[in-house]
C-alpha cells in the first residue's frame, strides 16, 4: 500500500498543498527557483509552508559575517533588539587557522553563538536569529552535515546552548536593504579593521 503524501509548494505558480505529484508538477515544472517538498502528514506540510514569524516582544538578533583575504581574519557583527529597540551590538574578529579557511562563514557561526550566549546571560529563554547564510540554520537543525571544524564546533556549542534558550531561525536575503542585517554586516566589516 502506498503511503499518502502531501506536497507543499512554497515558490511556484500557485503556492499551496497538493496530494498528487502530477498536480504539484503543474505548479513547479519550468518555474524558476521553484521550492517544494513532500511530507507524510498535512500538518508537516502546513508548518513548512508557514512563513517564519518572529516574536516582536522577544529577543531578536541579526547576525552577519565577513572575511579579509589579506589578513586571513574572519569576523561577525550582531545587532540585538527587543520590541524594535536596540539592546546591544556585538562584533569581533579572529584568525584561528582551524576556522579561517571557512572565510566569512566562521564569522556567521560565531555571531550566532555569541547572540545566543548574550541572550542566556541576560535571562532570555527565546531568541529569533535573522541570518543570511543558510548553514546557520541547516547545521543547527541537522539538515546539513558538518564537515569542517567551524561547522562541527558550531553544532557542538549550539547543542549546549539550545537547552537554555529556544531558537527560531529566520532567513533574510543578503544585501537586500534589511536595515538591521545591513548594520550587522557593517559591524562585521568594521571588526576586521580593529
Task: Tell where the protein language model's regions lie, with residue ranges.
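Eukaryotic low-complexity, Ser/Thr/Pro- and acidic-rich intrinsically disordered regulatory regions
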Residues: 2, 51-56, 91, 193-194
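RNase H catalytic domain
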Residues: 65-72, 112-187, 192
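RNase H-like nuclease fold core
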Residues: 26, 55-109, 118, 122
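A short beta-strand micro-motif
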Residues: 4-14
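A cross-kingdom feature marking charged/low-complexity
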Residues: 47-60, 160, 164
